[in-house]
């Protein structure tokens, strides 16, 4: 059995070095290349403001996030969902970097790579379509 979790995040900005945080995690489970119907989705209060540029991309406002749980309160449930799976992520270093940044703020958590394999679909797209746009919108149009 091959268990994969297709994952995406939204964030307050682009840089963990500026303490930007995850504000949304969405995942679907795939077993043997078939959707199982299991998913994980959570909006997260980042305990900081969302940069205007990021808000223009994803449309998630500070007001909407104000009553959402903080990452620490959902970390166990999220880790349980992804543990042991191969994560499939477009531009994986970005998402994994943010997930590791969030786990790094907590006690007794280790990096994602200790729990999961990671496949980066952006790397795959660049190999298959060199010199072309390989963002998700461009790939969906092909």
Language model features: what each stretch is:
Residues 1-116, 129-142:
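Conserved non-catalytic scaffold segment of RNase H-like nuclease domains
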Residues 115-124:
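Histidine/lysine/aspartate-rich catalytic loop segments that bind and position anionic ligands
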């Amino acid at each position: 059995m091959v268990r994969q979790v297709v994952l995406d995040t939204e964030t307050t900005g682009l840089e963990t070095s500026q303490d930007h945080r995850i504000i949304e995690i969405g995942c679907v489970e795939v077993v043997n290349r078939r959707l199982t119907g299991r998913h994980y989705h959570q909006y997260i209060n980042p305990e900081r403001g969302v940069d205007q540029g990021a808000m223009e991309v994803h449309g998630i406002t500070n007001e909407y996030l104000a009553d959402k749980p903080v990452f620490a309160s959902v970390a166990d449930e999220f880790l349980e969902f992804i543990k042991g799976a191969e994560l499939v992520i477009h531009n994986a270093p970005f998402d994994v970097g943010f997930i590791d940044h969030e786990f790094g703020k907590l006690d007794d958590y280790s990096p994602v790579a200790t729990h999961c394999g990671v496949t980066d679909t952006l790397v795959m797209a660049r190999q298959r379509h060199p010199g072309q746009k390989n963002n998700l919108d461009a790939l969906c149009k092909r």
